[in-house]
């Protein structure tokens, strides 16, 4: 029985919850409704939770309130994608509810889950039932009722998991698209994985990391990032230190959590990877010898590597003196746009974007990524163009925590972003620009061509793995094995009698022959439509289209 949870136990709950989510990230990704090759939910929740875990591991406290603040900050700044932002808000409310406590009981644990739900619902403009929000809500409500009958946090957490699982299984009855595809909600599944890790920790158990067999001959490739380091003397830990230890039978038994905590005292940038035979370690430290001595407790040192990062930094400075490196532009009003593909970035720059953040379907930037750009620009005002529905909430979260006056234009595609930026008026106020840029989003129809990563049926369209898919906004309107056929079916749906301009943005995987045939088809079938073609260079999507 566990009647009280202190900071140490809560830290272990976070660590085990993060590990269980990490182990199941691919499974969560596989539940994504749309079979596009992004797999964002599991990936984004995992990266978000990992950010919270790392913050906790670097700032351990026996006081649960203090630890909660640390965890919440890590989640907030590391949040990626809508699922990651919602996860961060669930625990933001949870941690806010315990901030004045040194330890909590079952009743406060349940109330904190409920507080998290209330915070998350407020953070979402239009909450949708049948999602992670529903699973969190149902589990929290059940927890509050159960806490009246038990003081055992283990029993409470077991009940929460039962109710969360029941809620998860019911999500297809609340969201028609889940039932059509035959899956449960991916975000809800990710949250359940976190809760299951919590229970493991409460029971004194450990979630073992899923790892591939390690290569005994290679270290993890590491390129030192000296961004933000002005003087060599500012480098606190001067030696990039790596070691490989083969576990010994008569040596100390290896416990990954203990190993990580001990190693973190030697420096920063810690990376630990292990299997049954060896452990690989990467750490930046001032005393490599201490790292090696510690490693010998567990077995034989089979590979060692030390690099002097101060000397490397001096070399970087010497090279930079000969090669001018542009600094981040300081502006009054920063126009920050998320972009995927060099060509698309150049389009945004030519239209007046001051800062480009690389990101998109396969890697959503975190809240912190956006915050850093705003802060480093030293701007007074900021306009953020997410250009992806899954980056919208992280953008709004970033805008809410920076000192600059920041607004988010709700662009959900690259074409919408281009259309919005075209409306920017340098002489208008921030609010005027926000209104006219947001209004322009409604005047453009966006389309895209990509491929399917699995068999499914959605929006009434039968889809086969590796077939091409044509989408208008988020709706799949065509899917065929032939690329040109899929494109022409898509454009037939997009183009109307009053369509005037069709913009085509070509991706890095587009075939020239298909592009030529597509343009010829457009000119023959729609002679009154003006066609603009740009090289975008975007991955995943062979083409982006916009119709105005």
From Swiss-Prot:
It holds the Pfam family FakA-like_M. SMART domains: Dak1_2 (SM01121), Dak2 (SM01120). Residues 8-200 form the DhaL domain. GO terms for biological process: glycerol metabolic process. GO terms for molecular function: glycerone kinase activity. InterPro entries: DegV_domain_contain, DhaL_dom, DhaL_dom_sf, FakA-like_C, FakA-like_M, YloV-like. Transmembrane segments: none annotated. NCBIfam families: FakA_VfrB, YloV. PANTHER family: DEGV DOMAIN-CONTAINING PROTEIN DR_1986-RELATED, PHOSPHATASE PROTEIN. This is Uncharacterized protein SAB1090.
